[in-house]
Structures are given as structure tokens and as C-alpha cells.
């Protein structure tokens, strides 16, 4: 019987790679064209599906050639081709099926399992979509792991005994990511992520294309953009030139018979110096510097704390990129593994772990943004803070906001702002069948659980009746890395203003709760209450109501402190008079949070 093999797949925006473990060592598999990288492009022509290099060559000439589908994963958008609409998962599945097919030919037997990598900032919907793409392609996705974690595995950092902090600089074809990881005791933990979801090696290619178009117009009186085939050749040559300039100071651009000019065929011969190329792309290099600084800041470390800097993505071969990294971090980056293949190698290693081929490595990833629920007054109450290591399960006890409330709405939010409305709404569900009781008495346990693949499940349970509702968050809109960073930045910029709003809301909720409590005490005690005590309570209630109307938060807080102390003394005196030791049911659970779930 053939030994179980689990494919390690880097399903990239621009290119994809597949690797396996063979004799306990990672091996990157070549596609039918003899390359280890396969363009993540699918084209349809005459009812035929074309994937990879052949499809990429049709991008300019075939309107039914589809690239960068990874950007749409997890959304409800579709792409039109072959006289029908395709979901992003379906197109990704065709890429995965192609990788699976040529991997099986290399291996010599069928393979049904895979580990697939995703960016660390991918949300639940994007991760679920990736798993579904694998399923459509005939693959059982054993694990979804973050790309920077896979890179660290590939570099063998799990074999190091000492604690390490590592920065992964990933410049792909269409996206750019920076991640900071911590390695301790053979475990990886992603501390932070940053980047630019619309920056990649293609942008460097485009600068060369623009330079070529300008030069060809000036020297040959021909506009390559007017001819789709000519433009395709220009883009191919631009990529080759970029690669050449990583190893040599000058590259010759040769494009024979590019098109027809006034005087016959146009044969282009141009030279581009590395110094010119670096000058025209300096602004792109600069765009990668800020995410490095941001990632370090989020991880709360200095550049001097880094033990390793790892390079991922073919574009990191550019000398200007390496020079900028070394200058910014004062550390030479590790270039010991092919940057095009490193993520797939890491995925294959994780596959080897799952297949029992490699001794166990524990991978720890983190949540990119805080997860919580909306509580009374519109407060965003966090349950799982940003950068919490996953897998994780956290629970908190909440209660009702109204007397005799039998149903609560659980609104799940994601973000760093203190008010729910300022964060991203991920989903909501109702828990009904709560036993009627005074506000604050029912105990509703809300639990968040995030599994190893980053999929979030939220449940709410009435501890008395046992009634429970659960949802798996599968939001149809996704967050790009820029949006995540923007949310973090907005939270920082609005921290003081948000804190004031939150303080006002919490004080209002506290005052309304005390008014409710005092009015209930007067009603419950009836004639037993001392007239003078009753008059004092009614006066205090009115003072609170007046301050609420006037929205004087500071005065209201002072008055609350005074009245709460008086109310406590009154409650103790009443209890002694009644000669009862009956205690407040809420006092038995120190974990009950003093924030109630609002009634929808």
C-alpha cells in the first residue's frame, strides 16, 4: 500500500506551488512545463479549460482569462466566463485540481489530502472558501495554515531550542505582507501582521512596461498598447527583465516583430540599467517600509529584538528590496531557501507532521482583530482580544437588560473600537426560551471558539433552562489587510473620544439600573419601609433622573457613588429587619459581567 502523502499547497494570488515530503525531506514538484511555480490563472476557450502558463499568456487577448481570483475568496462576487457565472471557490478549485493532477503524475498514485496556506489576515469566510475550493478539487483539506507560519517552518526554525523572534517579509506577485512570529519550545506564534493587499511584484513589472511603452513610442513611433498581442509580449519581457536585473547590472530587452510600423516590422532592442530600474521603482520600495514598522509596533518589539528576517516571494530577490530591509532592520535577511517555494515547503512539512512523517510541530496563529458582542447601550464588549493565540475558547456570563425578558439578540462584532456601531458586524442570532425573571437575574453564557483553521463559532446558553443557540461565523464580506490596519489605526486615533462615549453610556446604564433597583425596592417593601427612608429614596431617584436628562456624566457618577452607598446600607438594614439571610442570586457568580445584552 502506498504511503500516505499530504500535499503542501501555496495557493497564491499570482502563482501557486505544490510540495510533498519524500524520505522525510520536502520536495517541490515541477509542473508539465518544468517550472515549480504555476500561474494562478484559469482561461476558457472553445469550451476548454486552460490553467497555468498557457492561461497566463491569454490574459491580454482572451476576455475569459481569469487572474487574481484569491482577492475574491470569501465574497459573494462571481466572475463571468464560458457562458456562466463562477464563484471564486470554483475558479480556485480548478487551479488546485491542476496542481493535484500533475502532483499525482509525479508521485505515481492518487492523492486526496492537502494542507493549504492562506495570508494570516484571512477571515473566516476566506478560510472556509479555501477549504471549499479544496473540496471541489477533490481534496480533503487537513489544515489551513498561515503563510508566515509555513515560511518559518520551511526555514527549520522549529529545530532551534532558543526563543526567537522572526520577521517574515512576503512580497508576492500581487500582495505584500509582513508578519512577526515568536518561536518558543518548538511552537510558532504569529504576534502581528501588516502589509498592502494591492502591492506586489506585478507593480515592478508594470513600471518596466510603462518605461518600454514610452521608449517604443519615442524611438519606433509605435504604441504597443494598441495591439493586445504586443502588450502581452511586453509584460512577459518586463518580468524577465526584472528577474535579470536581480542578477546583473544591465538587461537587454529584445522584442523582434513586435508589430507593424509605417516602414515595416518593428524589432525592438533596448537596454535597461539596474540603477534606472531602481530609480523608477523607489516609490514601491518605500511602500513596503511602513508595514515593517507597523508590524514591529503591533508586536511591541524593536528591530534589534529580531533574531531572523525571512524572505518570501520571488520579488524579494531584487537587491533594492534586500538593501532596504537590511537598512530598516539593521539585519541581513535570510536567503537560504528559494523564496518562491518556501511557503509550499512549509505547508508540506505541516502535511508531513499530520501524516506522521515528521515529528510533531505545534503551530500557533492569532486573531487579527478583537472579537466580542454588543451589550446594553451599544458597547462592544470584547471576549477574544486582537492577537490572541488560536485555537482558543473563551466564555463570559451576561444577563438580561429588561424585566421578564425571554429572548436576547447576540450581535457578534469584530474590531478595536469601543462602540459596536463603529466595528464590523459579523453576524447575529437570537436565544429564546429564557425563563422570565427580573433584569440582571438570568445567566447567559456566551462562548467564542476559534479552531486551528481560524473558523469562529459563537454560542449562547441560558444556564438555568439549558436552552442554547450556536452559529459559525461565515460573513460574506471580507477584510483586506489594509482594512484591518485601518481599523486598528482608527481605534488608536479615536481612543479618547470613544472612551468618553463609552464612559457616558456605561454611566447611563448604571444609573438606569440603580433607578430600577430602587423603585423595585420601594414597591417590594411596601408599608414595611420607613416613610422618611422612602422619601429619601424617591428624592434620590428623582435626582438621578434629572441628571440623566441633563447628560451631566461627571455629576451623575458622583451622585451614583453616593446613592449606591446609601442603597447598600438601606438593603442591609432592611435585611436585618426582616431577619433573613437570603442573598442576591447574582452574588453567587463572580464571573457574571455587569453588562447586559440588549433586547432587540
Swiss-Prot record:
Q: Which UniProt keywords apply?
A: ATP-binding, Chaperone, Nucleotide-binding, Phosphoprotein, Stress response
**Disordered: annotated span:** 569-600
InterPro entries the UniProt entry points to: ATPase_NBD, Chaperone_DnaK, Heat_shock_70_CS, HSP70_C_sf, HSP70_peptide-bd_sf, Hsp_70_fam
What induces this protein's gene, according to its Swiss-Prot or TrEMBL record? By stress conditions e.g. heat shock.
Q: Which residues in this protein are found as Phosphothreonine? A: 175
Molecular function GO terms recorded = ATP binding; ATP-dependent protein folding chaperone; unfolded protein binding
Name residues in a coiled coil: none
Residue ranges with Low complexity bias: 569-578
Q: Which Pfam families match?
A: HSP70
Feature: compositional bias, Basic and acidic residues: 583-600
Gene3D superfamilies named in the record: 1.20.1270.10, 3.30.420.40, Actin, Chain A, domain 4, Substrate Binding Domain Of DNAk, Chain A, domain 1
PROSITE patterns, alphabetically?
HSP70_1 (PS00297), HSP70_2 (PS00329), HSP70_3 (PS01036)
Q: Which family does it belong to?
A: Belongs to the heat shock protein 70 family.
Job description of the protein: Acts as a chaperone.
Q: Write the protein's name.
A: Chaperone protein DnaK
Organism from which the protein derives? Mesomycoplasma hyopneumoniae (strain J / ATCC 25934 / NCTC 10110) (Mycoplasma hyopneumoniae)
Q: Which gene codes for it?
A: dnaK
Amino acid at each position: 500500500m502506498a504511503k500516505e502523502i499530504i500535499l503542501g499547497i501555496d495557493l497564491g494570488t499570482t502563482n501557486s506551488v505544490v510540495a510533498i515530503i519524500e524520505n522525510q525531506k520536502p520536495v517541490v514538484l515541477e509542473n508539465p512545463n518544468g517550472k515549480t511555480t504555476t500561474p494562478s490563472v484559469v482561461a476558457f476557450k472553445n469550451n476548454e479549460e486552460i490553467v497555468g502558463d498557457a492561461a497566463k499568456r491569454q490574459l491580454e487577448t482572451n476576455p475569459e482569462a481569469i487572474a487574481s481570483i484569491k482577492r475574491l475568496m470569501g465574497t459573494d462576487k462571481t466572475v463571468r466566463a464560458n457562458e456562466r457565472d463562477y464563484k471564486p471557490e470554483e475558479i480556485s478549485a480548478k487551479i488546485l485540481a491542476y496542481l493535484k493532477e500533475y502532483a499525482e503524475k509525479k508521485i505515481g498514485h492518487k492523492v486526496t489530502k492537502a494542507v493549504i496556506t492562506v495570508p494570516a489576515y484571512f477571515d473566516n469566510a476566506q478560510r472556509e472558501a479555501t477549504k471549499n475550493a479544496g473540496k471541489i478539487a477533490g481534496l480533503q483539506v487537513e489544515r489551513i495554515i498561515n503563510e508566515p507560519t509555513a515560511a518559518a517552518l520551511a526555514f527549520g526554525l522549529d529545530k532551534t531550542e532558543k526563543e526567537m523572534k522572526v520577521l517574515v517579509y512576503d512580497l508576492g506577485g500581487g500582495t505584500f505582507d509582513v508578519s512577526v512570529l515568536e518561536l518558543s519550545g518548538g511552537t510558532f506564534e504569529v504576534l502581528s501582521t501588516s502589509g498592502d493587499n494591492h502591492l506586489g511584484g506585478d507593480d515592478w513589472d508594470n513600471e518596466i512596461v510603462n518605461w518600454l511603452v514610452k521608449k517604443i513610442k519615442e524611438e519606433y513611433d509605435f504604441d504597443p498598447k494598441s495591439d493586445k498581442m504586443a502588450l502581452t509580449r511586453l509584460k512577459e519581457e518586463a518580468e524577465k527583465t526584472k528577474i535579470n536585473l536581480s542578477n546583473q547590472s544591465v538587461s537587454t530587452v529584445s522584442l523582434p516583430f513586435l508589430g507593424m510600423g509605417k516602414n515595416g516590422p518593428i524589432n525592438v532592442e533596448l537596454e535597461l540599467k539596474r540603477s534606472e530600474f531602481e530609480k523608477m521603482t523607489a516609490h514601491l520600495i518605500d511602500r513596503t517600509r511602513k508595514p515593517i514598522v507597523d508590524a514591529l509596533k503591533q508586536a511591541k518589539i524593536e528591530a534589534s529584538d529580531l533574531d531572523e528576517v525571512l524572505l518570501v516571494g520571488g520579488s524579494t530577490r531584487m537587491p533594492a528590496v534586500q538593501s532596504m530591509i537590511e537598512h530598516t532592520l539593521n539585519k541581513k535577511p535570510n536567503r537560504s531557501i528559494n523564496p518562491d517555494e518556501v511557503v509550499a515547503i512549509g505547508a508540506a512539512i505541516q502535511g508531513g507532521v499530520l501524516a506522521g512523517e515528521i515529528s510533531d510541530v505545534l503551530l500557533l496563529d492569532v486573531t487579527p482583530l478583537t472579537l466580542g458582542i454588543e451589550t446594553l447601550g451599544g458597547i462592544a464588549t470584547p471576549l477574544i482580544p486582537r492577537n490572541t493565540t488560536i485555537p482558543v475558547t473563551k466564555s463570559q456570563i451576561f444577563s438580561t437588560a429588561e424585566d421578564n425578558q425571554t429572548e436576547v439578540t447576540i450581535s457578534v462584532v469584530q474590531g478595536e473600537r469601543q462602540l459596536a456601531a463603529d466595528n464590523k458586524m459579523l453576524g447575529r442570532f437570537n436565544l429564546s426560551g429564557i425563563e422570565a425573571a427580573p433584569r440582571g437575574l438570568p445567566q447567559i453564557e456566551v462562548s467564542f471558539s476559534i479552531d486551528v483553521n481560524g473558523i469562529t463559532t459563537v454560542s449562547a446558553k441560558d444556564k438555568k433552562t439549558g436552552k442554547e443557540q450556536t452559529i459559525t461565523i461565515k460573513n460574506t464580506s471580507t477584510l483586506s489587510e489594509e482594512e484591518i490596519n485601518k481599523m486598528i489605526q482608527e481605534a488608536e486615533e479615536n481612543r479618547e473620544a470613544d472612551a468618553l462615549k463609552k464612559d457616558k453610556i456605561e454611566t447611563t446604564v448604571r444609573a438606569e439600573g440603580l433607578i430600577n433597583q430602587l423603585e423595585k425596592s420601594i414597591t417590594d417593601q411596601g408599608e414595611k419601609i420607613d416613610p422618611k427612608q422612602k422619601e429619601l429614596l424617591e428624592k434620590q431617584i428623582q435626582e438621578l433622573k434629572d441628571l440623566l436628562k441633563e447628560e451631566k456624566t461627571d455629576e451623575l457618577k458622583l451622585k451614583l457613588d453616593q446613592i449606591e452607598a446609601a442603597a447598600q446600607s438601606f438593603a442591609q438594614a432592611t435585611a436585618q429587619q426582616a431577619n433573613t439571610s437570603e442573598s442576591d442570586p447574582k452574588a453567587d457568580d463572580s464571573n457574571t459581567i455587569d453588562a447586559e445584552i440588549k433586547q432587540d
